[in-house]
Amino acid sequence: MVATSATSSFFPVPSSSLDPNGKGNKIGSTNLAGLNSAPNSGRMKVKPNAQAPPKINGKKVGLPGSVDIVRTDTETSSHPAPRTFINQLPDWSMLLAAITTIFLAAEKQWMMLDWKPRRSDMLVDPFGIGRIVQDGLVFRQNFSIRSYEIGADRSASIETVMNHLQETALNHVKTAGLLGDGFGSTPEMFKKNLIWVVTRMQVVVDKYPTWGDVVEVDTWVSQSGKNGMRRDWLVRDCNTGETLTRASSVWVMMNKLTRRLSKIPEEVRGEIEPYFVNSDPVLAEDSRKLTKIDDKTADYVRSGLTPRWSDLDVNQHVNNVKYIGWILESAPVGIMERQKLKSMTLEYRRECGRDSVLQSLTAVTGCDIGNLATAGDVECQHLLRLQDGAEVVRGRTEWSSKTPTTTWGTAP
C-alpha cells in the first residue's frame, strides 16, 4: 500500500473512459502500435499558400497576400499534446528519492516491530536511580557491569563492587527525600555542618559478576550504638537471584569544619530513625582483632602513594573506596594473579587529604610467600599510613584460588 500510493503520484493511473471514436480503445492505453512522437514546441508551422519573402537590397520584404512563417509554443497552442507513454515518464531523480523514502520507512517500521529483548537485563535502565521496596525500608538498584569495570580475568574488580555499594547508599538517601546539599547529608546535618564518615567495613564476596552481567543491590540502615548507624548491602545476580556479595558498615558523624567526631543531634535523629530497620546485620561481625604491622613485620611495602584530584569527594577528603586500591598496591603479584579476594575487613582510623603521602604495607600469613603459586587460601594483614607513621586504615583480606578461565585470544 505504501509503495502503491507513493508511486501513483509519478505514474498517472490511466482513465477507464473509452475512446470517443467508439473503437473500444481506452485513452491512455499503452498500445505501442499507434504511438507518434510528441510534437516539438520549437517546430515551424507554415500557413497555406505561403511564399518565401523576396529580398530587395539584401533585405526581406513582405508581399501582398503573403503569409508569415510563425512559431507555435505549447503556451499558445489551443490543443494540448496527446497523452503518450513517452511524455508521461516521470522525473527519475524524484522517483529514486521516493523509493528511498519508502524503503527507509519500511525498514524503521520493521525494526520497531521485530525488536525483542533477548535477555531480561536489556530492559535495565542504566540511568535509573532505583526504587524503594519492602514497605519503604529497603532501597534497590540495578547495575550493568561495564567493560571498564572488569579486570584481566574478565570479572568485576573489588573497587567496582564497592562503588556500587556507595552509589546505592547515596541514592537511598536521595530517593527518601533526605538529601541536603551535602554528600549524603540530611537537611539538618547540612545546617549543623555534619557529614557521615565510615569507621568499619566488612565485605564477603561469594562470586564476582562478569562483563555484561546485571546485579541487583539492596541496602538498608539500622541503629548502631548511641551515635552510629549501620548500613547493610545484599548484592544478587539479577537473572538468577544468586547471592554475590554481602557487606556491612558502621558510620558516624563528623563536623566538616573542625574535622572532629560528633554525637547525633536529636533533629538529625528524628530525620533518620523512621528509616531504621530492626534486623540483624547481613554479616556476622568478624570480631578478630586487626593486627598492627610495621616495617619489620611487613613482607611488602609500597611508598610514595599520593591522591589525585579525582580521588577526592565533595567533602574534600579521599573517598573510602580509593583506600582499597592503595591497600592492594602492596599485595604480591602472585596473589593478585592466582587468587581472588573473597573477604575484606577494614577499619578507617584517619581521613586522608589532598596533600597526603602514604605507605602501603602487607604481611602474608597462612602460607610461605615463596609458594604463593601453589597456595590455597591465603590471609593478608594490611596497613595504610601517612609518612609520619599515623595510621589511616588497618585491614585484613582473605583470598582463595581462582577458577580457571579461558584467556583472551586463545582457543577454548
From Swiss-Prot:
It is found in: Plastid, Chloroplast. Residues 1-64 are annotated as: Disordered. Optimum pH is 9.7. Its main location: plastid. It catalyses: hexadecanoyl-[ACP] + H2O = hexadecanoate + holo-[ACP] + H(+). Keywords: Chloroplast, Fatty acid biosynthesis, Fatty acid metabolism, Hydrolase, Lipid biosynthesis, Lipid metabolism, Plastid, Transit peptide. GO terms for cellular component: chloroplast; plastid. It holds the Pfam family Acyl-thio_N. Changing residue 259 to M: Loss of activity. This is Palmitoyl-acyl carrier protein thioesterase, chloroplastic. It comes from Arabidopsis thaliana.
